[in-house]
Amino acid sequence: MTTRFSAFLSGTPCELDLHRFPATSDPNLQAWDAADEHLLKYLNESNTELAAKFLVINDSFGALTCALATARSDADIVFAADGRTAHLGCKANLASNGLASAKVDYQDCTNLGSFAKGRQILMKLPKNLNFLTDTLSQLSQTLAAGDVILMGAKAKHINQSLLALIAKAVGPATASLTWKKTRIITITADGNPRPVSKPSVWDVPEHGLKVTNLSNVFAASKLDIGARLMMANLPQGHFSSVIDLGCGNGVLALKAAQTYPDARLYLVDESAMAVESARQNWALNALDEGRAEFIWDDCLSHLPNEVQADLVLCNPPFHQGEAITDHIAWQMFNDAKRALKPGGLLHIVGNRHLGYHIKLKRLFGNCKTIASNGKFVILQAVK
């Protein structure tokens, strides 16, 4: 696995040792991509003095932030990302490269307009276009006409439709020539604030629930097939402490709160917007706020030791950013085992082809199929 990252900024060589977070042994995964390299190359070749203040958005593991802190020791950087692993990865990479003293203010992506004024803005194109529109609309609240955003992206994702979406959200955009299959989108704010759209509320009538999502949360306006299967097949019994691991909008926890009226719920996700959506949905459905705790974390890495669950519900992702990987699922299963009481249940839903039953048998020594359809399977393991 390549960990050596090289770049030049304002003539300053930036030689860094960068790692993904959490650590992975997959040799095909690294802590940056060509779009990171292209953004820094573009800045270096712009023949302008490197700014002192930056807003860096969607910097997966801190490659951009580390390079800026190396090239300009007095840099004042706001690091904005929705994912907890991005924050932890950036902090770890700064520390391991002797940059722990860099001035970096860590923020999520729910109030970007308040950090944008007077800063040079660098960002990576997110996969979720609703999240992109929301991000740019937030920035439009405070950017003056002529302020520039530089956005790195894979060339295959850039087309006229995307440029039109950007223009509608904040101002006109043009794309550079291709380099290493990436392009830089230069966005010029037009100075007109756009309304930041409020998420719609939708019903799950078969379970008597109302649900809303912030912009970077999966399943924006309907119950996804896996969650639907899971909600119809929750385990029977009395559970006093239930963790919804990778909670998303919290819909599984909402159903668990109905099903287990005496249970305390822990809703955990690495997406700040997911955790906030879950919090809003708990209130939207008039559930007792004293029964729930909402946790923004890398799986269960920082769950207090005193929390011992008798049930963990989990719908594990099979990607991290654009990388297809199973190491997040492995971490979830290991963390769930650690957090469960003896005899506690891990109850998961996953795509049939992912073969999670093999992992669970290896880790727990047991696994049984609870339900399945053409695409998804519900599996259960006992600690």
Swiss-Prot record:
Annotated HAMAP family: 23SrRNA_methyltr_G
Catalyses which reaction(s): guanosine(1835) in 23S rRNA + S-adenosyl-L-methionine = N(2)-methylguanosine(1835) in 23S rRNA + S-adenosyl-L-homocysteine + H(+)
EC code(s) of this entry: 2.1.1.174
Homology family: Belongs to the methyltransferase superfamily. RlmG family.
PANTHER family documented for this protein: RIBOSOMAL RNA LARGE SUBUNIT METHYLTRANSFERASE G, RIBOSOMAL RNA SMALL SUBUNIT METHYLTRANSFERASE C
Keyword Cytoplasm found: yes
Stated role: Specifically methylates the guanine in position 1835 (m2G1835) of 23S rRNA.
UniProt entry keywords in alphabetical sequence: Cytoplasm, Methyltransferase, rRNA processing, S-adenosyl-L-methionine, Transferase
Origin species: Shewanella amazonensis (strain ATCC BAA-1098 / SB2B)
One cellular component (GO) term of this entry: cytoplasm
Molecular-function GO terms, alphabetical: 23S rRNA (guanine(1835)-N(2))-methyltransferase activity; nucleic acid binding
Gene3D superfamilies: Vaccinia Virus protein VP39 (3.40.50.150)
Localization (cell): Cytoplasm
Cell inner membrane among keywords: no
Name the UniProt record assigns to this protein: Ribosomal RNA large subunit methyltransferase G
